[in-house]
Amino acid sequence: EEIWSLINTSERTRKHCMQLENCVYDFFELTTLNMAQQGVFGEILHVEGAYIHNLEDYWSSYWNNWRMDYNRNNRGDVYATHGIGPACQLLNIHRGDRMKTLVAVDTKAVNGPAYIRKTTGEEVKDFQNGDQTTTVIRTENGKTILIQHNVMTPRPYSRMYQLVGTDGYASKYPVEEYCLRPEQVDTNVVANHENLNAHGSLPEDVKRELMNKYKHPIHQELEETAK
């Protein structure tokens, strides 16, 4: 209801209303976005994002236990923005494409109720959110988005951030890597680019040169300001 109130107010007043997301400004994300916008990966077909962060050591730190309560009372991907914000930028959502269909599934709830039982003794029979939620979205132009949410089980922190294009691939977790057709790598970046292949990660030195070449203007401006 609160979200629809914002939408209705925006439409009634003819004022822009947007959801802000900080992860779009990370260095790897902005650099990869710049590469994508300049055609390095060819046509972007599929992107992935997530919020994967085991919170079992942090639940008690949230004011009035609001975060566990929210997962207890609500079902679905309750924190999609970290993953879906950068993904939407890569696919030009609302800049020529739009989300068309969505399917979301979740596992049963195990670790949430177990944590409450362990810390309070309460047996929760109706815990709403599954330990993991997986969402698949298809766009009007035939692209796909995969988003995950998991704050309940042991896993290394990850926002996934993955891009699949007709001429290349990018992934941030667990290590930052690119995979490109050799001809997509400028000879100014690596002279013997024909020795590269499209089924392995770029060598670290090539990746470094590539990221420097496609450093986003926002980061260039910030670096100049910081000098």
Give the ranges of each region predicted by the language model.
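Short, mixed charged/polar active-site loops
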Residues: T144-L146, Y169
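A short catalytic or substrate-binding loop motif that flags glycine-/basic-rich loops and adjacent residues
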Residues: T81, D126-D131, T139-E140, P154-R155
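Predominantly a Rossmann-like dinucleotide-binding segment in NAD(P)-dependent oxidoreductases
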Residues: R12-M18, C23-F127
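Rossmann-fold NAD(P)-binding glycine/threonine-rich loop
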Residues: E2-H16
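C-terminal glycine/acidic-rich active-site capping loop/insertion
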Residues: N111-F127, R138-T139, D167-K227
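Glycine-rich phosphate/pyrophosphate-binding beta-alpha loops
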Residues: I147-S158
